[in-house]
């Protein structure tokens, strides 16, 4: 495969900046996507409007706040083209492409972004909130995640185990590959489920990526810091147009790719357990959907009618139905994400300290 055989040389920008001036690389990664978004964003929104690439929404009867959500019908989607495009371009320019971790992150980001694009395109052309089939999504995500799992297990050193803070490593053997697939696929879809309110997914992603950006200094994967800063900067730029009331949505093009990238970063850092903590908001969103589906099917078999565990899933809609405004849900979820990120970084630091003793 390409990943097993290719060893792309470091880019010119990496040789100039990262090798001799690593701080300059981090500054550029942290600023350029944000600045570029300010100039590209309005033009992209205008193009998407001209192409009538509007976001289909659920039927009014199914919406937790029908009048408010119906106003969003027609808001341009596929804003992830700008967000993920800037991340990919920045990765090619500033990141060390000879690093297996960077290669894996770039692969998953590109594949899931393309998958998200196909899904968004299907929704727009069909004028429906249903895109490509869920089975097709899982298959494509599984192929990309399988490539990463095999590459790390067979072609890179130091992989094949699960690191549990304060407890050490558990060797997984060949089970490491399906474990990697579970992490990446789960993360990709969890972020996708979170992208249901203006600014919610992008804001939580900024916090999670910043937390993981602090971890390379702790766990020894500094080559991922520029990649994570690119995500933070691009999400900040996108949030300028995605905050309430949103002028553009990232669509599955952005959310599937961001989630896939975050999951791959956690795998490459060997911090899958911390992903559950730092990405706790994403986990809660995904778990709420699984609980809702399970409970509905269980009660339908037992009582003859399906009952809901939450007012509505994903869980951000549960709070909307409980009377929280959209901005209240977003800000409070951001606060929860920040608290979990601080907790995760604290656990990582203490784990390193205990290991060094």
Language-model features: locations:
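Juxtamembrane helix-capping/reentrant segments at transmembrane boundaries
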Residues: 59-75, 127-140
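Extended accessory regions or peripheral subdomains of proteins
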Residues: 143-144
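Membrane interface segments of multi-pass transport proteins and intramembrane proteases
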Residues: 123-133, 164-170, 300-302
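A cross-family signal for N-terminal binding/gating loops and helix N-caps
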Residues: 49, 54, 70, 82
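Alpha-helical transmembrane segments
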Residues: 1-49, 85-114, 148, 152-155, ...
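Interfacial loop/helix-cap signal at membrane boundaries in integral membrane proteins
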Residues: 3-14, 18-19, 67-68, 73, ...
């Amino acid at each position: 495969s390409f990943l097993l055989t290719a060893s792309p040389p470091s880019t010119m920008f990496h040789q100039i900046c990262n090798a001799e001036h690593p701080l300059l690389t981090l500054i550029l990664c942290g600023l350029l996507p944000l600045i570029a978004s300010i100039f590209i964003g309005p033009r992209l929104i205008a193009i998407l409007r001209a192409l009538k690439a509007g976001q289909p929404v659920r039927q009014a009867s199914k919406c937790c706040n029908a009048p408010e959500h119906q106003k969003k019908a027609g808001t341009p989607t596929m804003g992830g083209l700008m967000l993920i495009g800037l991340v990919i371009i920045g990765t090619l320019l500033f990141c060390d492409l000879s690093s297996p971790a960077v290669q894996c992150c770039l692969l998953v980001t590109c594949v899931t972004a393309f998958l998200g694009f196909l899904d968004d395109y299907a929704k727009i052309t069909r004028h429906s909130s249903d895109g490509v089939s869920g089975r097709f999504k899982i298959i494509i995500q599984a192929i990309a995640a399988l490539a990463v799992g095999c590459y790390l297990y067979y072609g890179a050193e130091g992989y094949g185990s699960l690191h549990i803070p304060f407890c050490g490593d558990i060797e997984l053997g060949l089970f490491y590959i399906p474990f990697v697939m579970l992490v990446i696929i789960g993360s990709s879809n969890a972020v996708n489920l979170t992208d249901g309110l203006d600014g919610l997914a992008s804001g939580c992603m900024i916090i999670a990526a910043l937390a993981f950006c602090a971890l390379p200094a702790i766990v020894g994967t500094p080559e991922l810091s520029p990649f994570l800063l690119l995500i933070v900067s691009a999400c900040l730029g996108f949030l300028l147009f995605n905050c309430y009331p949103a002028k553009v949505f990232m669509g599955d093009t952005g959310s599937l790719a961001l989630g896939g990238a975050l999951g791959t970063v956690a795998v490459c850092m060997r911090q899958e357990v911390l992903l559950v903590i730092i990405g706790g908001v994403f986990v809660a969103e995904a778990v709420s959907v699984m609980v809702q589906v399970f409970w509905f099917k269980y009660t339908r078999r037992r009582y003859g009618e399906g009952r809901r565990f939450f007012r509505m899933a994903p869980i951000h809609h549960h709070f909307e139905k409980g009377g929280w405004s959209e901005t209240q849900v977003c800000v409070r979820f951001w606060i929860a994400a920040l608290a979990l990120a601080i907790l995760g970084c604290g656990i990582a630091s203490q784990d390193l300290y205990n290991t060094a003793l």
